Amino acid sequence: MSDLAECMLAATSKPRQKAALLVLEDGTTFQGTACGAQGEAYGEMCFNTSLEGYVEVITDPSYAGQVVAMTYPQIGNYGVCIEDAQAAHPALRGLVVRDMCYTPSNWRSNISLPDYLEREGVVAIEGIDTRALVRHVRDHGAMRAVLSTEDMDAESLLAKVRDSELLVGMNLVETVSCTEAHPFDQAENVDSRSFALAPAVPARHRVVVYDCGAKRSILQELVRVGCAVTVVPWNTPASEVLGMDPDGVFVSNGPGDPDAVQATYAQVGKLLGKVPLFGICMGHQMICKAAGGAMEKLKFGHHGGNHPVMNLQTRRVEITAQNHGFNLVFPSLGQLVSNGLGDISDHPDDLRWWVDANRMPIVENKRFGRIALTHVNLNDGTAEGIAFADIPAFSVQYHPEACPGPTDSHYLFTAFSRLMDGHDDYLDIDIAKDRLEGWRF
């Protein structure tokens, strides 16, 4: 065998691996091999449809309490660049992949993905039929799962997973939030990707961020649109926040059941109408809960970078990055306001009706006046964004920071800046121009 052939064989071979087992709470079992830390991990099974960005997914605090399956077949090809991490450490419970790469090729890589998972204590499995797993979760809904490299008895693992905690009712935000207020260090705002982001503009707005599990890229984007950011814990009293004299308040993404995070949405309710607010993902849910909105658990959640969302104001379709398992029940915010809707007085069963009707519905909320539905998911008709008409506040369920994911919705950070500037038409933005001026392409 030639030296070149030996090198190629060494580069593509895998180390001797330990057996691993994945068991779902309905008894479905998948056998594979370990490709991360040793041990057992329990969590809710979900899947992510992103083709790349696994580092950002693994380090996203919103995945706390979950076992994540990547639908793309080969993961780890470009290793792990620590600068891409969204938090200091992964929050997910376990990782499932079809084929793990042990020999990454990328000039930015600091460490291979299997070595990173082992270092961070994340249990992972490879070699299973991830397509079958994803179809099963899609058809039967999200469910508890256990991933083990220690116990190879499926019946034993099934009993243990059925005795594990449910995600519903669990406050996971408190496990990923900061513990004390601190400024976001702009020195952390670095990016050495080959397609660099535009430089941040000078700070002209003071923004307080409720940390429900904030991704680093979100804080970076706030800096890029001119915000001096102070991050505070998830349960910080509204009076403390107002005492900081902010120009705006941002409520971040985060994991778990929004109904369990009462300490946050109670404070958000005290801030609405007193200072401009913007929320993303869990932050959107906190704003909706503060307005009396009800939440529902989705069958298998939205996790990935290919979700089409219609902006009802501009009639543009945005391809969005999403990561949530709960969603707003829009009719729970109030009764429909006429507003040129003709004889329509009852909420349609499917919010995509508003897309077909070319209308943007507005409800009358008992606490905060008129609220418009601004964005609708075209896949399943769920609510994806709202804007308050009588107070300065808006929110979206998806992730406009696009780490990982498409950049279609990056304009929303500019919209927040315009809202703090006092523009009534803050959402009226030339999206194409905004993308060219402030984002990679």
Q: For the regions a protein language model found, what residue spans apply to each?
A:
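RNA-binding accessory domains that recognize and position tRNA/RNA substrates
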Residues: 2-227, 231-239, 243-244, 258, ...
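Short solvent-exposed loop/turn micro-motifs enriched in small/polar/acidic residues
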Residues: 13-16, 302, 368-369, 378-379
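Short clusters of small/polar residues that mark proteolytic maturation junctions
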Residues: 34-35, 72, 300, 322, ...
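Proline-centered loop/turn at the N-terminus of a beta-strand
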Residues: 123, 206, 276-278, 294, ...
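Cysteine-nucleophile active-site neighborhood
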Residues: 243, 248, 252-334, 405-415, ...
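Catalytic beta-strand/loop cores that center a nucleophilic Ser/Cys/Thr
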Residues: 316-391, 437-441
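Short FAD-binding loop at a beta-strand-to-alpha-helix junction that anchors the flavin cofactor
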Residues: 392-398
